[in-house]
From Swiss-Prot:
Entry cofactors: Mg(2+)
Entry EC number(s): 3.1.-.-
GO molecular function: 5'-3' exonuclease activity; ATP binding; double-stranded DNA binding; helicase activity; hydrolase activity, acting on acid anhydrides
Organism of derivation: Oenococcus oeni (strain ATCC BAA-331 / PSU-1)
Protein task: The heterodimer acts as both an ATP-dependent DNA helicase and an ATP-dependent, dual-direction single-stranded exonuclease. Recognizes the chi site generating a DNA molecule suitable for the initiation of homologous recombination. This subunit has 5' -> 3' nuclease activity but not helicase activity.
Keyword Membrane belongs to the record: no
Gene: rexB
Similarity comment: Belongs to the helicase family. AddB/RexB type 2 subfamily.
Entries under SUPFAM superfamilies matching the protein: P-loop containing nucleoside triphosphate hydrolases
Signal peptide, first to last residue: none
Miscellaneous remark of the record: Despite having helicase-like domains, this subunit does not have helicase activity.
Name by which UniProt lists this protein: ATP-dependent helicase/deoxyribonuclease subunit B
Pfam families per UniProt: ADDB_N, PDDEXK_1
Superkingdom, taxonomy of origin: Bacteria
Length: 1161
């Protein structure tokens, strides 16, 4: 018998050496049997390669994969089955099985018995953490109860192990009919003495370490060998990377783990040094030597060249993968002998790339196998189960959408299910119906009265409403059926049966089967996982009292722990994998992506219940007890093995290696080069340099490096042509168009100008009518962005209504309370300033109570949250009324009209009550009629000479003369025109001012309060009685002494408290104020008329350019627009802002500019 260890560095060809040895024994011993053992992950590729190479030694065709009865290639688990010829009859225990039992135990245990875990035991994820920790302990060959006496201290670790042992003792009896995943190996180890292993030889390749169960099997084989059970001529040979001599860095040594394995388990074996060298390129041979020297002695013996190795950096991850895909495709084209299966793409973690790689590799038509598990928790079946069981609110919007958007529940035979669901979603977002509404009311997305004629539009509207109500009834039936059946469930056996029957009754299993028939088997995999979980629940806790919360958590844990199985890369595909996964070592080319300091080496953190500090204690405990330690390593120990993982990963390829990383991370932070590569790039180590890869070719000579498929090249070249001009890609255009006709359209896009065309007159008439009937806000919208005006008022597009208190609803609520309160004062002929604060509060609250009973404001009493919002809005109005009340005490003004409408309205009653509107004749003889509504008109003096226009605003608006000049601030001036026209009907001679009133809905500014020496307890809490004195009316005030005296009497050196004007010490008007002279007012009003007519003329001529106003770098007309996705504003396509910074800001300069323009006209 012979136990041998074959050692060598990663540049050595272990496989050929082992096969030559097998071949020699094969030739001279016809009775010998050979078992070639490799890690499970590379079993298939290794089997093909081993048998092919062995066939070559025998003189067979080197291209055939020979299967010899005397030479078998196995993984350890497959070896156990092959030699015992039996499968474990017990069900393999899963994390889910243990989680189910742990959860049940934790629910039954008194909380005080959980000791250190008493607080965390009820937190999400704790059950899964306990289950994972117990499984780790069991896989090490021990139980928590066996570990407990090894730790002879009364400390935190002892408390943890006691709780784990307590839980363990309660669940193990339930697991007697189950086996651990590695039990087959342990069972095989115990049965070896009974198995005929005569003439058997075992060769292990590719292992850098063994689990506890694997090691038990290895030890059993060695023991059988020593007892000559295998025969005197048999041998067991292990290949082990490294050498024993280079151990000066301890745990940080490159070969530390391999050396520890040799020292602890194979010290009596005969060591055999591999002489065969792998066919590595110069770069790979030099990498092996340089990295080995750096990691074993701290320096390299000489500087080496790396001609087949590159380090490249790209701007971001997408461009990084685009470079990799482009480079791979060019290699495959340039080298006909190179196959896709010869290429490996590696990353430490693929998480940040798993969505990018498929998209870009598909664009380049590259076949690939993504060797990365995808979790099942995002599958629609998981979402369906979790949302059916998870919400107490049966008709909650999110629950409804998550259940019925899965595509697993539908009415049969018709294809309008999704359309109906879309319409229903619009209704739910706008109305948020409660369960009572669902059951008792018909939903109307589009309001239709019984008197409306059944024209085509109304027929469609009725069909939409009917479709919504069909969906409503369908959903009620589905959800009620589920609720009724689960209401009868008393234990988990019934729960399992009920859920399964309900899903099959709804034909969910058939939907998933149909998906599988169409090529997507993920649903079938998820369905099998669900059935497996239900079986485990039924077997383990079927007779326990049912808890829907716990049942839901069991299902969620099951979906979260499961992954979709992929098809191995057995065809001609590029392998995309992670460096922690064992790979074969005969790839021709390696692309190591994300080679940045954030990923390489990997940073690991322990999240298990037994943390790193605990593990260090246990290692010491096991050492003192002279017992082998097979629990997981600490995070630090894992990180010390990173250098060997990097070494092995890079040497997975024989020819070339390309390291790449992106300068910009997904989180927006900057990447730097990996410290591993920085060491390799040192001037005294290698000639490696970092090559920056531009996103686009920088010269015509570079174009060839950016070409791939027709599709990928079209994307690159169109961007290049956009940046450098079409001449830059001259010569390639015709070729690409032949390969991909769509490229012609891409090139045309280079000349695309994203500007709307002028509309034809007939379309204008259909959209806006013969004459224009507009509001002032509509004209302001036109000047703010003409194209958005067209979308909103021409096409009448509007965003989807949502059940929320937005600015429009709160504004309407504010105005309605103001209107009711002021109208009651007008009706009672009560002066505003005669009221007390208490009377104002009573009037406000009575008005608010009247309003929330109206349908328009039903949202404000729909739940506690919105009732609180209503109280807050009412408080805002009350505070504003109090502040206006204080201002009113300084003069004799009194409100005489609220919500004063001017312009033609629909009903006769409204027409009688409204003021005369404004109308102007346009360029082609058509008319523009303006309508509006003035929030409030005050009679400012006892002689009824002056009136003041008041407009409520919730955004602290002030009158901006620059906005008035460009047309986005026309409201106050147009109101002034309307009131001047209607002054006799109102009861005043003329308007004297037009001002905005800010509704006080801003939180108190603490810093401003302190600056005004106001104590904080006057701003917050029960004593909040004093407001920061910054309340003022802002707008336009006529510079007339009689008018100003009726606002507030101001002496020299004083400023008006509530209006923006004052006097200097010399009695002159202050420069910065809202005052305008009569002459300047005339200019402003004429300019206002001009802008109104100008907008009308442009509208009737169909001019709606995409030309949004831009006030500053932070704010433009697009900042809060609902139409940005339609407009696609892009300066690259010729779009420009109407930048206000090019106009003067000074009031006098702007009025002079208006006067000049008026003179020109």
């Amino acid at each position: 018998m012979t136990l041998e260890i074959v050692r060598g560095f990663a540049d050595r060809d272990f496989r050929s050496e082992l096969l030559e040895r097998i071949y020699e024994k094969y030739r001279i011993d016809p009775q010998a049997r050979f078992f070639y053992i490799v890690p499970n992950h590379i079993k298939f590729s290794a089997e093909v390669d081993v048998l092919k190479k062995f066939g070559s030694l025998l003189g067979k065709n080197d291209q055939e994969a020979q299967a010899f009865s005397r030479l078998q290639v196995y993984s350890l688990s497959r070896l156990a089955w092959a030699l015992t010829k039996e499968r474990d009859q017990k069900t393999i225990i899963s994390n889910q099985s243990v989680s189910i039992l742990v959860g049940q135990v934790l629910r039954e245990l008194p909380i005080e018995k959980l000791n250190i875990f008493a607080r965390s035991a009820r937190m999400p994820g704790f059950v899964a953490n306990v289950a994972e920790q117990l499984l780790e302990i069991w896989r090490s060959g021990l139980t928590a109860s066996e570990i407990l006496p090894l730790h002879q201290f009364d400390d935190r670790l002892s408390e943890k192990i006691k709780v784990l042992a307590l839980i363990e003792t309660k669940i193990l009896p339930s697991l007697k009919d189950y086996s651990l995943p590695d039990d087959a190996l342990r069972n095989f180890a115990t049965q070896i003495s009974k198995i005929d292993l005569k003439n058997c030889n075992f060769y292990f390749e590719g292992f850098s370490g063994f689990t506890a169960s694997e090691l038990s099997l290895v030890k059993a084989l060695i023991s059988a060998d020593r007892k000559t059970q295998l025969g005197k001529k048999s041998e067991i040979v292990f290949s082990l990377t490294g050498e024993q001599q280079s151990d000066q860095y301890g745990e940080g040594n490159l070969f530390y783990r391999a050396n520890q394995l040799f020292k602890n388990e194979f010290s009596s074996a005969r060591v055999w040094i591999v002489s065969n060298i792998r066919p590595l390129s110069e770069s790979q041979l030099n990498f092996e030597q340089s990295w080995r020297e750096l990691e074993t002695q701290g320096f390299t013996s000489q500087k080496r060249s790396f001609p087949q190795t590159k380090i490249v950096v790209s701007s971001d991850q997408e461009h990084e993968i685009d470079f990799v895909a482009r480079s791979i495709r060019q290699r495959l084209v340039d080298n006909p002998k190179l196959r896709a299966k010869d290429i490996l793409v590696l990353a430490q973690r693929l998480d940040g790339y798993k969505n990018i790689i498929p998209k870009i590799f598909d664009r380049y038509d590259l076949p690939y196998f993504l060797d990365k598990d995808t979790r099942m928790s995002d599958h629609p079946l998981a979402s369906l189960a979790e949302n059916l069981l998870g919400s107490s609110n049966e008709f909650a919007y999110e629950r409804i959408m998550k259940i019925f958007r899965t595509g697993l529940l539908s009415w049969q035979l018709e294809d309008n299910f999704q359309t109906a669901l879309d319409y229903l979603e619009n209704y739910l977002l706008a109305n948020n119906p409660k369960e009572k509404n669902w059951r008792q009311e018909e939903f109307q997305l589009i309001q239709i009265s019984d008197e409306q004629d059944l024209n085509d539009d109304h027929k469609i509207d009725r069909q939409i409403n009917a479709l919504i109500n069909r969906m409503r009834l369908f959903i009620i039936k589905i959800l009620d059926d589920f609720q009724e059946k689960f209401a009868k469930v008393e234990n988990y056996h019934q729960a399992v049966k009920t859920l399964y029957n309900w899903l099959t009754d709804q034909q969910v299993d058939q939907v998933l089967l149909n998906q599988a028939n169409d090529g997507d088997d993920r649903g079938q995999q998820t369905w099998k996982l669900l059935l497996s979980t239900l079986d485990e629940v039924d077997q383990l806790i079927g007779d326990k009292k049912y808890s829907q919360k716990d049942f839901l958590q069991i299902l969620k844990d099951g979906f979260a722990a499961a992954s979709f199985s992929g098809i191995p890369a057995s065809l001609d595909q590029i392998t995309v994998s992670e460096s922690g996964i064992v790979q074969r070592n005969d790839f021709k080319a390696l692309y190591f992506i994300d080679a940045s300091d954030a990923s390489l080496p990997a940073q690991t953190n322990s999240s298990s219940l037994i943390d790193d500090f605990d593990r260090l204690q246990l290692i010491d405990d096991f050492s003192k007890a002279q017992k082998p330690y097979y629990l997981q390593d600490t995070s630090r120990q894992e990180m010390t093995a990173e250098n060997f993982r990097f070494y092995s990963s890079v040497l997975s390829a024989t020819d070339s290696v390309t390291f790449s990383y992106s300068k910009l991370r997904l989180d927006g932070k900057q990447n730097e080069l990996s410290p591993y590569l920085r060491r390799l790039s040192l001037k005294n180590v290698s000639d490696l340099k970092i090559e920056k890869i531009p996103d686009l070719p920088q010269s015509q000579a570079d174009l060839v490096d950016y070409l791939g498929t027709a599709n990928s090249s079209a994307a690159i070249l169109s961007q290049t042509a956009q940046n450098f001009g079409e001449d830059f890609i001259d010569g390639l255009t015709d070729l690409l168009i032949k390969r991909n006709p769509y490229f012609q359209r891409i090139l045309q896009a280079l000349h695309y100008n994203n500007q709307p065309v002028t509309l034809r007159p007939e379309l204008i008439k259909k959209l806006f009518g013969e004459d224009l009937r507009l509001s002032i806000s509509q004209i302001e919208k036109y000047y703010s962005n003409p194209y958005e005006y067209f979308l909103q008022y021409g096409l009448r597009l509007k965003k989807r209504n949502q059940f929320t208190v937005d600015a429009a609803l709160s504004g309407t609520y504010y105005h309605s309370i103001f209107e009711q309160v002021i109208n009651r004062l007008i009706g009672k002929r009560t002066d505003f300033h005669d009221l007390s604060d208490q009377e104002l509060k009573k009037l406000s609250q009575e008005s608010a109570q009247n309003l929330i009973e109206l349908p328009d404001f039903q949202i404000l009493q729909s739940d506690d949250h919105f009732r609180a919002v209503a109280r807050s809005l009412t408080d805002d109005v009350l505070l504003t009324l109090k502040l206006m009340h204080r201002a009113n005490r300084l003069n004799n003004s009194r409100p005489i009209k609220t919500e004063a409408v001017f312009g033609k309205l629909s009903s006769d009653q409204q027409r009688e009550q409204s003021l005369s509107g404004l109308d102007f004749t346009l360029a082609n003889g058509r008319k523009i009629y303006l309508r509006g509504k003035v929030d409030r008109i005050d009679q400012q003096d006892l002689e009824h000479i002056f009136g003041t226009i008041i407009d409520y605003k919730s955004n602290g608006k002030v009158f901006d003369f620059r906005d008035a000049y460009v047309g986005t601030e026309l409201q106050l001036l147009t109101y002034w025109l309307a009131l001047s026209k209607n002054s006799s009907r109102i009861g005043i001679n003329q308007p004297g001012g037009a001002v905005f009133v800010q509704i006080r809905n801003k939180p108190a500014d603490i810093s401003q309060a302190l600056a005004h020496q106001i104590q904080l307890d006057q701003l917050i809490g029960d004593r909040a009685k004093q407001q920061v004195p910054d309340f003022q009316f802002h707008g336009i005030l006529l510079d007339d002494q009689n008018y100003l005296a009726n606002l507030q009497t101001v002496l020299a050196g004083q400023k008006a408290k509530y209006y923006n004007f004052g006097l200097t010490k010399k009695g002159q008007k202050t420069a910065r104020s809202d005052l305008v002279s009569k002459e300047d007012l005339t200019v402003l009003l004429k300019h206002d008329e001009k802008k109104l007519v100008e907008a009308g003329n442009k509208i009737i001529h169909g001019e709606f350019p995409l030309y949004p106003i831009k006030k500053n770098e932070q704010r433009s007309a697009l900042t809060y627009s609902d139409y940005t996705e339609i407009m696609n504003f892009d300066r690259n396509f010729g779009n420009q802002y109407n930048n206000l910074t090019r106009y003067p800001k000074n009031k006098s300069e702007l009025i002079s500019k208006m006067r000049e323009e008026e003179g020109e006209n």
